[in-house]
């Protein structure tokens, strides 16, 4: 028997090890990886918190269960129920083991579930904003109330569980006793049996349940700030004047009832307990009836007047929660009185008008610049660079390896050879080639670079498509990039990766379920495995509590490619703030910068005023760095994120209204303008463009994220909403309100204006014939002083699966003028009736000569193409090129 007991503990440990084997392996690998990326302390924050919490919670559970058990044992000796445990210590030992296991299990479940809320509670940071009903700082609702709610749910659940298990234990032991004594089970004596077995214990538990019902209603009081019963989010008139009153009464009555219950137990009287429970139930029912009566017989007929203070609370706090309370609001009185000098003064804005559009450009990149089938461009980013001394807006994209496209897709190819992407492409947004394609300033492999931007190490080991692990510094050379005669190879010289010792090879073989880690003869001791290479997943693994933007973007700095990911702090706990997309508070409080070669991942705090990110910084020490610690050249490329701007625009459509009466009437609602991508195509919500512009009253151009607003369910544009991002202006928002008594064309109305123009419509119909299709580019509405300039690139796509859209024309509109032109410059000249190609250029003669030379060169290109088409018998192409030649010759007359 002793030998069996001696074997039990080792056997139990072995079973536990087998059951948690994969988790143990994963835990070891996580330690190695977090150590490699220098965030081991962040990883251990959770573990340390769980262990520290488990110890006192285990002691509380263990002692509480043991004391409850002991009290039942004492009652057992006075009861008819004989559980047979007093004759030896076996039952006590068995219960001790049971109690130990249950207490550890419950302590672990509680600690692993609520460690984060407890740390949030301990590291609470004030918002310095108080709710208007209970005058508590917002931090109470975000950092403290969630813990109170969790504790309430856990304790109530445990108390109810205790009641249920007590009844179950009684019935089991009673049945056992009856069977052993061969007596019949008498259901009539159950009431007496329960009282004698656990009457006082159950009464105490009932008193505690009533006590926590009181606490639960106190939580309900605080949760009134999230009420959705009124016309706006947050506590309404009925909530404050009826529901709140009854909740307070219930809190007091249930608190008294819990005390009465405990005193009644001591005196052995149970009638007062029944009375207290009855009163509590009556009050809960009465609260619902009273709230219904107040809402329907007092509020309903006077709602606008009675609800105004609460609507104002909702407006003020929603605007604060979504960072809309600091918007600079200006009237934009459209005069359309631009002169040539105004055009000259805004030359940089006009020179940066985007005629390349996202989707067609990405298609072109993926057909012309992937070089080999195993490369891909995941998406296109837009940014601003000083190129050869000029401030330019550009498109750029990283050329990544698409491992799913490899052929053959072997383990060596996927993980040892094709380890990284190579290079980037860049084109200015404002220029195209004579064929209507993006005009590259960086392209090809190895990079052909016409800029002053250095790109000396263009390898991409970490990116948006790098979803697999790779093993570097093996006996096989890594593929670097293709050449005509042979492939260029490379050895990884970065510091990322975990050394592949035999133990680590074994660990990863188990973790990845791949025997190749052990069988491969190419892996050396100095080889390293690089895991978690997807930049978003990498950031999430380090800081899973942040929300990440859907569009990471690349930056070229110090000869390498870096990735920037916007990280958000969000909550749905901000009082009185109306939820949008399941959140009612958001800040872009951090930027994540990731090195594409070394994988260095840095989190920079960009909003020091945000209490949530400061709470994270206190909780996860060593995670965040100051924004000033980021290189200046990286900071210059920080963008105002589109995901944040999108949700702010959605909220602003309703919450630009500050007057509660107007808000109640719903008479001034906005929505983001609609747009149309195809002639006679479906309409979609306009995608806010990043544009280079000079804001009114500013003396230099800057990059601005701009959205266009319509009146709800109308197409007339009513406002322009912009977010600034250059230098010290970063994060400043401005709202231009357009005159409501004028028809201001939105992107959609602009498209309708184009379709209704007989000359342009005729051209579009001609191009949109069978075999080709016209599609619109990205609509830009550019404010210049007190005027609006509309720009619409036109793309022509030939039939065929792999056809590439070409930017053939630009439509410009100003005031009542609408022109179809081959370029922005030509369109501006036509609108303002100037014969100069560059308006107000001081060196008019030289600039005209330069432009004439460039046009003559284009004319020669079209002439050569026309002759070539004539030789091939392609008369359609011949006609197109002759038309283009004619346009150019007409423009330089």
UniProtKB/Swiss-Prot annotation:
UniProt entry keywords in alphabetical sequence: Cell membrane, Membrane, Transmembrane, Transmembrane helix
Matching Pfam families: UPF0182
Membrane topology field: Multi-pass membrane protein
Main localization category: membrane
Disulfide-bond pairs as recorded: none
Gene Ontology terms: cellular component: extracellular region; plasma membrane
Signal peptide span: none
Transmembrane segments: 9-29, 49-69, 94-114, 154-174, 202-222, 246-266, 273-293
Places the protein is found: Cell membrane
Family: Belongs to the UPF0182 family.
Name by which UniProt lists this protein: UPF0182 protein CLD_0809
